[in-house]
Amino acid sequence: MQTVLAKIVADKAIWVEARKVQQPLASFQNDVVPSSRRFYDALQGARTAFILECKKASPSKGVIRDDFDPARIAGIYKHHASAISVLTDEKYFQGSFDFLPIVSGIAPQPILCKDFIIDPYQIWLARFYQADACLLMLSVLDDEQYRQLSAVAHSLNMGVLTEVSNEEELERALALKAKVVGINNRDLRDLSIDLNRTRQLAPRLGSGVTVISESGINSYAQVRELSHFANGFLIGSAMMAHDDLNAAVRRVLLGENKVCGLTREQDAQAAYESGAIYGGLIFVEASPRAVTEEQARKVMAAAPLSYVGVFRNASVADVAAKSEALSLSAVQLHG
C-alpha cells in the first residue's frame, strides 16, 4: 500500500481504536441480531444488478452532494436498486454509521456498509447499525485477515462484497472462495479510473461468482457494454452529482428514453413508473394521438416526466407559444 490508500488505512486504524473507546463492543454486542436481508440473493437473477450508493463526498471529487439527505436518497433508490451502499467513512467521504439505519428504515433492500474495514469491531458495529453486508478490500487485507473478517460477517448473516483491483487480488479472491467480487476500476493508490480493468479481469472469474463493476460508471452506454462482462454495477458519484437524482438514476440505469403520444394521465403515470424520462405530446391535428393544450396540462400534471412537444409544419409562433405556455423541456419538429 502507498500514497492515498495507505494514508486512508492508517487513519482508519486510529479511528477504530478511538471508536472502541467511545462505543465499546461490550456495550452493544449482545444487542446485535443477524441480518434477515439476503445480500447474495439480491444480486442473483437474469437482470443486471445495481448497488446504488449514498455518497456525500470522496477524496477524488471533494463534496459531491451538498444537500445530502440519506432518507430522500433511499426513497428514490428503493425503486431501482438491488442493494444500497452507504459510505460510513467520516474523514474522507463525510459518511457516518448513523446513515445506515436511516436508509435501512426506508428501503427494503440489503444495505451494504462501504468502508475501509480492517477490524472485526467494524463489522459488529455495521450490523448493530443495520447493515446487511460489508465491503472487504483485498488491497488492504491479507488472506488471514480476510478469512477472519468474512467469518464474522457470515456469522451475523451478512454478505461480503470482496473488492479486487488487479490480477493478484483476483486470484486471491478465487482461492478465498468469494461469492461476490467487486472489480474496482479506480486505483485507490492514485485515484485514476480504468474501465478496462473490468473487461480484463471479469472473464477470469467463474460462473459461480457474481461480478460487480465498481467506480467510473456514469452512463447507460457503459452499463450496456460492460454488462457483457459483469453481473452488476456499484454506482454512486455519477448520480450523486445531479440535482435531479431521480432522473439521474433513470438515465444511467435505463438510458434516455421517450414514450410518445401520451393522451391520458394514466399513460403518463405508466410511462414514468416504467422508467421513461421524456413524455411526448403530439400537437398535430391529423394525428390520432393529438392533444389540445388543456389535455396536455392534465397529462403533464399526472407524472414528473420531461415533456416534449411534437409539431409538424407548425409556425414558429405556434411552437413558441405552446412551449412557453406549457414549459416544455424540448420540441420535436417534422415537415
For the regions a protein language model found, what residue spans apply to each?
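C-terminal helical cap(s) of enzyme catalytic domains, especially alpha/beta-barrels
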Residues: 195-205, 227, 239-260, 293-302
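Catalytic cores of alpha/beta
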Residues: 118-130, 165-176, 213-235, 240, ...
